[in-house]
Regions:
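A short interface-forming secondary-structure element
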Residues: 52-71
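Hydrophobic alpha-helical segments that drive targeting, anchoring, or assembly
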Residues: 40-43, 49, 61-63, 94-98
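Short secondary-structure junctions
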Residues: 23-35, 84-90
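Charged low-complexity stretches with an acidic bias
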Residues: 67-94
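Short edge beta-strands and adjacent turn/loop segments
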Residues: 28-56
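Polar/charged, Gly/Pro-rich intrinsically disordered segments
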Residues: 87-116
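Intrinsically disordered, low-complexity linkers and terminal regions
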Residues: 8, 13-14, 59, 72, ...
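N-terminal presequence-like segments and adjacent domain-start helices
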Residues: 1-21
Length: 116
């Protein structure tokens, strides 16, 4: 089991590196996109994997989700995961969208609490 845990931790580090590249790409392409993060329980991987794309405000988030940017973010996520050696049947099930504005409004800016 320890070897399995180490392998999963290594896989997560690779995933973070690939998602960082996806984030940088999106920041140059998608208006209002700020950053992304992920949560995962390695004991329930990959089912527990959740990737959250964060916008500066609700307006930019709504605009992105109404247009082609949503598909672009899902495609960037799928490519990043694939580059890390992670293949999921339904990448979109693991992707969420949020905004800094909503976090401040609903959770006082506490992302740890919001993402639980």
């Amino acid at each position: 089991m320890a070897g399995g845990k180490r392998a999963l931790a290594r896989l997560e580090r690779e995933m973070v590196a690939c998602l960082t590249e996806a984030c940088a790409t999106a920041q140059g392409e998608i208006v209002g996109f700020a950053w992304l993060t992920h949560q995962v329980d390695l004991d329930d991987f990959p089912a527990s994997l959740r990737i959250t794309w964060v916008f500066t405000d609700d307006t930019d988030k709504a605009r992105a989700l109404a247009g082609t940017d949503k598909a672009r973010m899902i495609a960037l996520t799928a490519q990043a995961l694939s580059d890390a050696g992670i293949e999921l049947d339904h990448v979109a099930w693991h992707v969420r969208f949020d905004s800094e504005e909503a976090c401040w409004r609903d959770h006082g800016g506490d992302w740890n609490r919001r993402l639980r």
